[in-house]
């Protein structure tokens, strides 16, 4: 299984969520609402979940082994960092243009 596409939208909130992503697996299956969270030990990827009536969060979809989780996390965080570098370049270009 390979992550063949990552679509990511950065969010600017007061909380710890930094972005929301959708991934495509093997050009055949899409998973939406994956979140990039700024945790105590750095960024991590949280799979889509819903709140149960008793207040617990349950994953809607999630990898069943650490290798697959690693592939998903690497793909999403690489895209997150790539977009951050693009934004920095745009900000520097705009600052230099005036």
Swiss-Prot record:
One family name in Pfam for this protein: SpoVG
Protein name (Swiss-Prot/TrEMBL): Putative septation protein SpoVG
UniProt similarity note: Belongs to the SpoVG family.
GO biological process: asexual sporulation; division septum assembly; sporulation resulting in formation of a cellular spore
Gene3D superfamilies assigned: Stage V sporulation protein G
NCBIfam families: PRK13259.1
InterPro entries in the record: SpoVG (IPR007170), SpoVG_sf (IPR036751)
Organism: Bacillus pumilus (strain SAFR-032)
Role, per record: Essential for sporulation. Interferes with or is a negative regulator of the pathway leading to asymmetric septation.
Keywords: Cell cycle, Cell division, Septation, Sporulation
């Amino acid at each position: 299984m390979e992550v063949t596409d990552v679509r990511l939208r950065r969010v600017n909130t007061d909380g710890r969520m930094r972005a929301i992503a959708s991934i495509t697996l093997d050009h055949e299956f899409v998973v939406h609402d994956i979140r990039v969270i700024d945790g105590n030990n750095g960024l991590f990827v949280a799979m889509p979940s819903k709140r149960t009536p008793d207040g617990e969060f349950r994953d809607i979809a999630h990898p069943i082994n650490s290798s697959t989780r690693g592939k998903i996390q690497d793909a999403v965080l690489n895209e997150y960092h790539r977009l951050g570098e693009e934004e920095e370049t745009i900000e520097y270009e705009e600052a230099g243009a005036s």
